[in-house]
Amino acid sequence: MDENSVTFKGTVNGLTIILKNEPEFSEIIQCMRDKVNSAGKFFRGAKLAVKYKGRILNEEERSQLLEILVRESGARIEAFEEDKEQVQNVANNVSSDKPVERKNQIKKYMFFKGIEEGQTKFYRGTVRSGQLVNFDGNLVILGDVNPGAVIEATGNIVVMGLLRGVVHAGSDGNKEAIVVALGLNPTQLRIADIITRPPDEKGVVGNPIPELAYVKDDILYVERFLPTR
């Protein structure tokens, strides 16, 4: 495996990942995982805005790389998107007066930072595979969270729909945070530093049942959510 298939480059604003075009994507995945693990001390606890360049990725490939960063780096990933500043002929520093046009450009990761609107942010719509929704406070999703999507908040997370992606509440270490969803079937559920995954056989069948996830004595519990009136 070519160790240079994936190169990490620290920048003033975060991290740039340079991906080679030639290797199979399985090699990119393995190299990415190795690089993340070897840089664990650098990433752990950091807040990173990440850009990638050098290789055009489809939605599924972007989703896989994002999951590696979120699950294995120990960092809080605040953005993950294609580098918009890639210019033709970078190697010989030749600038061009003509704009770089890309027809049928692959849709980039959509990223929602959250505007200062108080302590709770409402996100309206479905969070799709490859999207990262992150907020410093409580987060309410008015829609579904699809597999391959990632939602994070330093406070509580409420999903008014089916939650089937990666969810991280209390991302700043707050173990008092909770996760509530009308249908709770995430690929990964995390509160503070406590992580769990659903059993393989679990699935949302028929009418979903609202559920609540919380931490008590460093154990993550999931139970039916029956709010009192």
Curated annotation (Swiss-Prot):
Q: Which residues cross the membrane?
A: none
Q: Does the keyword Nucleus apply?
A: no
Domain of life per record: Bacteria
In the record, biological process GO terms are: cell morphogenesis; division septum assembly; regulation of cell septum assembly
What keywords were assigned to this record?
Cell cycle, Cell division, Septation
Would the keyword Cell division be found if you checked this record's keyword annotation?
A: yes
Disulfide partners: none
Task: Please name the InterPro entries in this protein's record.
Answer: CAP/MinC_C (IPR016098), MinC (IPR013033), MinC_C_sf (IPR036145), MinC_N_1 (IPR055219), Septum_form_inhib_MinC_C (IPR005526)
* Record family assignment: Belongs to the MinC family.
Q: What does this protein do?
A: Cell division inhibitor that blocks the formation of polar Z ring septums. Rapidly oscillates between the poles of the cell to destabilize FtsZ filaments that have formed before they mature into polar Z rings. Prevents FtsZ polymerization.
Q: How does it assemble?
A: Interacts with MinD and FtsZ.
What's the protein name?
Answer: Probable septum site-determining protein MinC
Please state the gene responsible for encoding this protein: minC
